Structure formats: structure tokens, C-alpha cells
Amino acid sequence: MSKIQYLKKYLVISLIAFGLLGCSSPSVKQYAQETPKLDLSEYFNGTIDAYGIFTDRSGEVKKRFTVLLVAKWSVVNGKKTGILDESFEYSDGTKQKRIWTLVETAPGKYTGTADDVIGEAIGESAGNALNWAYTLALPVDNSIYHVQFDDWMYLVSPKVMINKAQMSKFGINLGEVTLSFYKR
């Protein structure tokens, strides 16, 4: 292999590696010192109102929606377990219901299940942030698509949380869901 071929090969591999690094998410641990500290079972307890939008990958708003969330936590088999009952109402008049079961598996570590979540959502919190990773069965027209979510929540005050979730399929960005939660 000539020196020029070697350099070209090295350059291509380096560009691919740097490109992949640019696609990675931040670590939730980088928020460990941020306040107010998020206690999932404290924030998601009681009634919460949320307002959100879905934007496609170009940034155009495709859907607006509101969510009424009623949550309650208890101890089941020695673990904190939360039931989050979400009622969605979209700007086109359609309605949707999702009931999450969240389990704190260790301090700052969570799993979540819901009827339209494929397998389990895996969550980790630190400081004021929480990151969820999960696959959702998303109905579009007459089809169901399994899409991946990289879901970030940030507690900005004791009653307000901001949520941004990147939605992708096969690693291709499809859009973003943005929500603001207001605890009553």
C-alpha cells in the first residue's frame, strides 16, 4: 500500500469515527451537580399538565398536543413503583392514552413499560436530568412503526420540567418531541 493510499484510508476511517462521535448523546452524569435535584417519584406524583409539539427533521411543527398526567407511587416488592396515566389530546382532535409503569431498580436507575413501548424503557437520572431510551410502536396512517426515542427531561424548578426527545429509525433522525410539564 502506498503512502497516499494509507493516508486516504486513515483519513476516511478518522472522519467516520469523528462522525459517529458527533452522533452520541451526552452522559446524564454530566448533570450530577445541577439543581434542583430531580426525584422522579416526587415530581411525577399527583396531577401534571403538559404542552407539547412534534417537529419533523426540518423543524416544521407537525402536531401540537396537551397531556393530562396523573401519577402515583407505591412500594411493590421492595421497589419504588410509579403509575403514570397520560391522556393526550392532539390539535386535530384525536386522543390517546398511555399508562406507564416505572420501577426504580437502583438509585437513579429506572425501567419503564407501557402498552406501546417495545420491551422496556431504560432510564437514568443525575442532578436535574433524566435520560430515557426506548422503542415505541408508533401508529402512522394504517401502519405501525417501531421508532427509537432518546428522551431527555430537565427539572428547571420544583414545578416545571422541560422534555426533549429525539425520534429516529435505523439511526436516521425523524423529528423531535418537545414538552413542558407543569406540576399542580
Regions found by a protein language model. Give the residues of each.
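Bacterial signal peptide processing site
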Residues: 24-27
